[in-house]
Amino acid sequence: MQKTQMLSAEIFRRRGHIRKQCPLCKSHFWTLRPDQEVCGDQPCTPYGFIGNPPTKVAVESLRDVRERFLSFFERHGHARIKRYPVVARWRDDVYLVGASIYDFQPWVTSGAVPPPANPLTISQPSIRLTDVDKVGRSGRHLTGFEMMAHHAFNYPDKYVYWIDETTEYAYRFFTEELGIPPEEITFKESMWEGGGNAGECFEVLVRGLEAATLVFMHYEVKDGKYVELPLKIVDTGYGLERIYWLIKGTPTIYDAVFGPYLAKVRERLGVPEPPRDVMAKASIYFGQMDPEVISLDKAYDIIAEKIGVDGKWLREVVKPQEALYVLADHSRTVAWMIADGVIPSNSGAGYLARLLIRRALRGLMLAGVDAPLVELFDLHLKELRYDYPEVWEARSLILELVDMEEKKYREVLKSAPAVVKRALEENRRRGKAGLDKEDLVTLYDSYGLPPEVVAEAAKSMGIEVKVPDDFYSLLASRHVRREKGREATLVEMAKVADLPRTRELFYEDAYMRTFKAKVLRVIDGKYVVLDQTAFYAEGGGQPADTGVLRHSGGVAKVVDVQRVGHVIVHVVEGDVPQEGSEVVGEVDWERRYALMKMHTGTHVLIQSIRRVLGPHIWQAGAQKDIPFSRIDVTHYKLPTPEEVAKIERLANDVVQRDLPVYVKVMPRNEAEAKYGFILYQGGVVPAREIRVVQIGPDDEPYDVQACGGTHLRRTGEIGLIKVHKVERIADGVVRFIFTTGPHAVAYVQELERQAAEAAALGGGSKEELVEVVKRLLKRAEEAEKKARHYAELYAAALAENLKAEAVGQRRLAVVELDDEELAKRVALLATKRDPDLVLVVKAGERVTIYTGGVDVGPIVKALREIGFRGGGSKTFAQGVYAGDVEKLKEAIRRAL
């Protein structure tokens, strides 16, 4: 969509800004300089601040810039709010926060929920992998960055501020706080879109660098079209790292942001610091090049010519630095992610974390750097601990996971030749030559093989493979958004849209067993809508209630209950009630009460798992059922039996303490402010107000989650929590299967019965089970030893007494043996004793040929002529033959 209006601001008229159009990119921009011809943005304008910063303001760290920004906006009436996590657990469309506005989408931006303050200011760590392939190369791109921002939310009945004030704030911040001359600042008109919203914007440019973007958001993006929002939102983004780079004027953004860390890494690895003038010139030219037009390899040659150096020499200087820049950026981003609960894996946010770790590793390998990645990460964690204390708190977990990932990656690389060979052969069979981009994606996603490694392996087989310069960006783009499953509904929404919202009695009183209601609608003779119901509708991993509806015409059995929009639909069998009639509903209380124990038990268990295994534990799925329920959690290895026992003890301690369970409905902002985003253990709750389930007293709650299920009043009602099984169901996901209440008691009793039965078989009691098993194992070991001895004697006897016929200089023997291990032993002994022996072992249609030194090639060839199917090595063959044994012997005789 084109911009709907010329962007202007009162400050431009007041201060004499001139609106111009860039002859190169055709964009309009505002400037104080009559002689400025181009827009001031890359690639139209080269960097003019490298080695020549536009200000002499005294700032020594990112922290200084951040504090200047936040304090400036606090002084101008903005509330400073705490940064959000980088994992967007309050959203169901994306995994990671890509900008500060993500914190407020979709609830605040849609008008459903008020903002935490208005106006507000924040410095939000953000992650974008859109340009991951450019990181380390361009001199300016990052995957992780802090977006400093000020936001204002204008409602139809409440105006805060809009274009004029926003532009004035930006002008004053850059000139007054940072000391940048007014004539150095250009405001370029543009359009911005992200996170489902859009709006016109100003890009704030200084000497070729975009330092901030001022978005005037008033659209929602629906089906590719812009629809006006009820709100007008000021969405600004000031790049903390870019502004610090602008002030410092270093050759690259990495030298400014990660300077102390890079110095330590260079010292540790023995990598010299590059010539500053060369890196500065290279960075300026790299910044002007479009990687979609000019390949990276070609870019080196062009830049080398421009700065008057040899292309090979430039590569040797720059490439090791690129690897260090990638390491610096990726290690910080990965640290943020893991500290926020992301476990590297093959799916979701874990996929992106693994991608960054492996890209950092690959870069170091290509640069010839030999050092444990975990050691280099640790150097960075020590630098990050003051600005990001949560990263330092997660240090041991981060280092353990990085170490595990490096070991996995090195194992993956060993498989490359065989995997690539198979892929090439498969393509050849399908009439396809070589490997294309999609093949490279498949090999990465399925086997973890980076494209450079695939290309090397293919080259050794005489096949050239082109590696796209944007390969990792392509991978990331396919994994940054959450997949939304399509919700199936029992009946069409249109058939119930006119009905009032169903009153949810199961929320008003979870212990209600019977109720009276009026039938509002019957659809297709089996779907019943009531004005109110105590039947719980399936949701949040809790199955629907069952029971009956009694009415004047008989009894209808309720077999399922589902939500369709704002109404609850009962699926019934039997005597269907008439519309307008009165019914008495009876919930299957024994089943419902068991599910309530399972649901409250689930909350107790996941908190116990989190307290034992660590704060990185997040729910990845759950299903409450009878007699067993399951909960899937993010964890990188199978818990030990000792850890599982500790989890079980902790959970049952909560049961024994008989803690109160509170259910309260709270405004979303209030709940998030009080409890944090741990609320969303069970997933996103799409509502202005959320239902909060708290286990334990207010001053010391054991667990708090947003939840729509039915719960007990006290934990003592659970009775018992028993873990049945723990297993890894996917990379980075562990499943706990458990049971509660009477079902847990029944399960324990069954275990006791089995233990007693097993002990009795060994002649003991269940209390003596361990000793009985030890005794039986010892007997079994002795019996196995004797069996091996007798098997050796038997094999020796068979080998000694083989009836072999002479065939020229060879000897031929055919025996029938079903025991494959015995046959191998006989063959080993017999052929060792007689190298000229050809031993044929037949077991049904299976035929195996052993020799001590005789070439079986001619034998196999002869046998194929009579129907043998199989093959083998020089002295061994195996296959299938269904014909006559005498014909088989005759064919072998001819071959010998």
From Swiss-Prot:
Give the keywords, sorted: Aminoacyl-tRNA synthetase, ATP-binding, Cytoplasm, Ligase, Metal-binding, Nucleotide-binding, Protein biosynthesis, RNA-binding, tRNA-binding, Zinc
Residue numbers binding Zn(2+): H599, H603, C707, H711
Give the molecular function GO annotations: alanine-tRNA ligase activity; aminoacyl-tRNA deacylase activity; ATP binding; tRNA binding; zinc ion binding
Major subcellular location class: cytoplasm
Q: Which reaction does it catalyse?
A: tRNA(Ala) + L-alanine + ATP = L-alanyl-tRNA(Ala) + AMP + diphosphate
Cross-referenced Gene3D superfamilies, in alphabetical order? 2.40.30.130, 3.10.310.40, Bira Bifunctional Protein, Domain 2 (3.30.930.10), Threonyl-trna Synthetase, Chain A, domain 2 (3.30.980.10)
* Names of required cofactors: Zn(2+)
A single Pfam family it belongs to is tRNA_SAD
Q: Report the EC number(s), separated by commas if there are several.
A: 6.1.1.7
InterPro entries assigned: aa-tRNA-synth_II/BPL/LPL, Ala-tRNA-lgiase_IIc, Ala-tRNA-ligase_IIc_anticod-bd, Ala-tRNA-synth_IIc_core, Ala-tRNA-synth_IIc_N, Ala-tRNA_lgiase_arc, Ala-tRNA_ligase, Thr/Ala-tRNA-synth_IIc_edit
Presence of keyword Lipoprotein: no
- GO terms for biological process? alanyl-tRNA aminoacylation
Please share the entry's free-text remark on the cofactor: Binds 1 zinc ion per subunit.
| Cellular component per GO, a single term | cytoplasm
Compartments reported by the entry: Cytoplasm
PANTHER family, per this entry? ALANINE--TRNA LIGASE, CYTOPLASMIC (PTHR11777:SF9), ALANYL-TRNA SYNTHETASE (PTHR11777)
Q: What is known of its domains?
A: Consists of three domains; the N-terminal catalytic domain, the editing domain and the C-terminal C-Ala domain. The editing domain removes incorrectly charged amino acids, while the C-Ala domain, along with tRNA(Ala), serves as a bridge to cooperatively bring together the editing and aminoacylation centers thus stimulating deacylation of misacylated tRNAs.
Purpose: Catalyzes the attachment of alanine to tRNA(Ala) in a two-step reaction: alanine is first activated by ATP to form Ala-AMP and then transferred to the acceptor end of tRNA(Ala). Also edits incorrectly charged Ser-tRNA(Ala) and Gly-tRNA(Ala) via its editing domain.
Q: Which HAMAP family match?
A: Ala_tRNA_synth_A
Q: Which family does it belong to?
A: Belongs to the class-II aminoacyl-tRNA synthetase family.
Protein name as annotated: Alanine--tRNA ligase
Originating organism: Pyrobaculum calidifontis (strain DSM 21063 / JCM 11548 / VA1)
Read off the lineage from the record: Archaea, Thermoproteota, Thermoprotei, Thermoproteales, Thermoproteaceae
